[in-house]
């Protein structure tokens, strides 16, 4: 395109944003001068062009500069710091092949994210042979095994801060030769209760270490980490306008508390949503209540929460990404419980922070303590869920910030997605006690902040209207199913699931590396069978079906239908069969004849 001439017939300078965009379009991995083995891994994984954060961060990282980058989850932040670290390790090994030391440390807030980062490192180091070794310290292994893993000085260590401090205390891990430090999801590390561990690490890490702070938001916690670890960092505030949720259609439904279950049943039974769905709920109990409710109608789903063993949680995410399961019910516990905050951040909040990011204050009596199990669990941030068609906020989050992170699980990598949220009007709160939650009291005020925040990003949260006349026809079936899902049934389901997953977790750890075929036998969406299942609820009578939905759910060829039930006289037939064998029921007052020619036992006189 020709540029306009000014008064002196000189072409006007090219606009800065256009120039920047042109540079981004021209950028490729070849221009980054990476090691051929890394480029080979990129080609294998079909990485053609670097994302915005990769194009900006990798050249700066290769120059040795500290980096503070803000970019949304799914923008390629992991590769932006893994590739420069691997490049430096390979260069060091090229000059000194016998060099052995831990030179890279990657800190993450959760075990799930640690496993994900470890997989990325393994993928990019696939062609590096024995030149690059990495260890994930969050794996459930004994201290003796972990000490053995660290004794060989792995080049790269991926861990939560707590595990690093533990191994430093036992002298199993040495950071004397550390050259790279990464804190991924930096805004979560302090809020997840790692403040003491971070302060201990700040004293143990040598000076002059190159630091990467990666975060989706720049908060007070990130500023604290910046002061502890960084030396004049380059700050990258990257907002790819093409990737800021533009592909996510956002809808909200105002409904009563029990109608959440009714609408969920209708959505899945009539297949109103095609593809994979993540259902976000408040806590673990809610997780199993929704799962047991869906089981009543023969709808399979799997759960993800902090109570499950780490191997099982990782396996659930992997299988969900492969398309083995279509419905994942996730307990967003950290968001509901309230992250543990430092004294400084508490004072900042009390002074008054942006109303966009703050939820409604929760009564102290209703807050639960965060257990050690929950400390390193998080699902709405960092985890790379693939090809998610819809995010269903069964329970609305308490902040607009959390809402943004939840809906970020869909519409990733240029694809489209949908976010549907259930909102309880204030006058409906507490009217159906069995399904009521404390957080729904503030749904309307939180929704107002969500709409405001999304409006600033140029997105609209639209109301979604169901044809309630048709939906109401299903209410009696929903009521029957919900009545069967009692509090006792939920508790039994939790205990049963944990027992099953513990067994599976051990097998995953010890056995399945040698027998990968048997992985198919492990299903996380099996029925829990703790609630009374009513078989008739699994089928929809034709008179309940909406006119438009009949074709999609029924085929023209009905096939053979027997006049009588196949199992009609099952018990009677079994009884008759056993009676023929001499095992039948003995009726009171009736003596059985004894043939003296067949037995030596004489009957009583």
From Swiss-Prot:
Keyword vocabulary terms for this entry: ATP-binding, Helicase, Hydrolase, Nucleotide-binding, Nucleus, Ribosome biogenesis, RNA-binding, rRNA processing
Region of interest (Disordered), residue spans: 1-30, 339-373, 564-605
Q: What is its EC number?
A: 3.6.4.13
Binding positions for ATP? 71-78
Point to the regions of Basic residues compositional bias: 572-591
Q: What is catalysed by this protein?
A: ATP + H2O = ADP + phosphate + H(+)
Q: Which SMART domains match?
A: DEXDc, HELICc
Which residue numbers does the motif Q motif cover?
A: 27-55
| Helicase C-terminal domain mapped to chain residues | 247-469
Which PROSITE patterns does the entry link to? Answer: HELICASE_ATP_BIND_1, HELICASE_CTER, Q_MOTIF
Quote the function comment for this protein.
ATP-binding RNA helicase involved in the biogenesis of 60S ribosomal subunits and is required for the normal formation of 25S and 5.8S rRNAs.
Domain description: The Q motif is unique to and characteristic of the DEAD box family of RNA helicases and controls ATP binding and hydrolysis.
Give the family, as the similarity comment puts it. Answer: Belongs to the DEAD box helicase family. DDX56/DBP9 subfamily.
Record-given protein name: ATP-dependent RNA helicase dbp9
- Source lineage: Eukaryota, Fungi, Dikarya, Ascomycota, Pezizomycotina
């Amino acid at each position: 395109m020709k540029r306009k001439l000014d008064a002196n017939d000189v072409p006007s300078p090219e606009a800065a944003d256009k120039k920047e965009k042109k540079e981004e379009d021209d950028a490729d991995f070849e221009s980054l001068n990476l090691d051929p083995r890394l480029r080979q891994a990129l080609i294998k994984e079909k990485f053609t062009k670097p994302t915005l954060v990769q194009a900006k961060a990798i050249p700066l990282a290769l120059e040795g500069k500290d980096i503070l980058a803000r970019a949304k989850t799914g923008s390629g932040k992991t590769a932006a710091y893994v590739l420069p670290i691997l490049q430096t390790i390979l260069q060091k090994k090229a000059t000194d092949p016998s060099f052995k030391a831990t030179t890279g440390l990657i800190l993450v807030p959760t075990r799930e994210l640690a496993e994900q980062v470890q997989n990325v490192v393994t993928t990019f180091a696939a062609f590096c042979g024995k030149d690059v070794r990495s260890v994930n310290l969050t794996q459930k292994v004994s201290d003796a095994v972990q000490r053995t893993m660290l004794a060989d000085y792995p080049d790269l260590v991926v861990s939560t801060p707590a595990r690093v401090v533990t191994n430093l205390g036992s002298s199993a891990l040495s950071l004397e030769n550390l050259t790279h430090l990464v804190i991924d999801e930096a805004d979560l590390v302090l809020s997840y209760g790692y403040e003491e561990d971070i302060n201990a690490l700040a004293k143990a890490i040598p000076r002059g270490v190159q630091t990467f702070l990666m975060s989706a938001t720049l908060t007070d916690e990130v500023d604290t980490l910046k002061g502890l670890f960084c030396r004049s960092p380059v700050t990258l505030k990257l907002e790819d306008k093409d990737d800021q949720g533009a592909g996510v259609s956002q809808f909200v439904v105002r409904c009563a508390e029990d109608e959440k279950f009714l609408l969920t049943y209708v959505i899945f039974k009539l297949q109103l949503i095609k593809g994979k769905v993540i259902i976000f709920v408040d806590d673990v109990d809610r997780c199993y209540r929704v799962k047991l409710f869906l089981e009543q109608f023969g709808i399979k789903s799997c759960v993800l929460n902090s109570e499950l063993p780490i191997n099982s949680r990782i396996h659930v995410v992997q299988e969900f990404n492969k398309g083995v399961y279509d419905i994942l019910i996730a307990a967003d516990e950290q968001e509901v419980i309230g992250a543990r905050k430092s004294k400084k951040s508490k004072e900042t909040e009390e002074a008054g922070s942006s109303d966009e990011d703050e939820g409604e204050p929760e009564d102290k009596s209703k807050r639960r303590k965060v257990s050690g199990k929950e400390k390193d669990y998080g699902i709405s941030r960092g985890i790379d869920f693939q090809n998610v068609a819809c995010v269903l906020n069964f329970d609305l989050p308490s902040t607009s910030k959390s809402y943004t992170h939840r809906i970020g699980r869909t519409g990733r990598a240029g694809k489209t997605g949908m976010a549907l949220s259930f909102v309880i009007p204030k006058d409906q709160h507490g009217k159906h006690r069995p399904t009521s939650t404390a957080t729904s009291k503030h749904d309307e005020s939180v929704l107002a902040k969500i709409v405001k925040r999304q409006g600033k990003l140029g997105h609209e949260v639209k109301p979604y209207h169901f044809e309630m006349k048709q939906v109401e026809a299903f209410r009696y079936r929903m009521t029957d199913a919900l009545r069967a899902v009692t509090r006792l049934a939920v508790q039994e389901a939790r205990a049963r699931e944990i027992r099953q997953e513990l067994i599976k977790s051990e097998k995953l750890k010890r056995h399945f590396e040698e027998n990968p075929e048997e992985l198919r036998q492990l299903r996380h969406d099996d029925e829990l069978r703790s609630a009374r299942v009513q078989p008739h609820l699994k089928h929809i009578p034709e008179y309940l079906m909406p006119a438009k939905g009949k074709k999609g759910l029924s085929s023209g060829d009905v096939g053979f239908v027997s006049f009588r039930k196949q199992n009609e006289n099952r018990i009677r037939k079994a009884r008759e069969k056993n009676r023929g064998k001499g095992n039948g029921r003995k009726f009171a007052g009736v003596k059985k004849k004894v043939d003296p020619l067949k037995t030596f036992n004489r009957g009583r006189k």
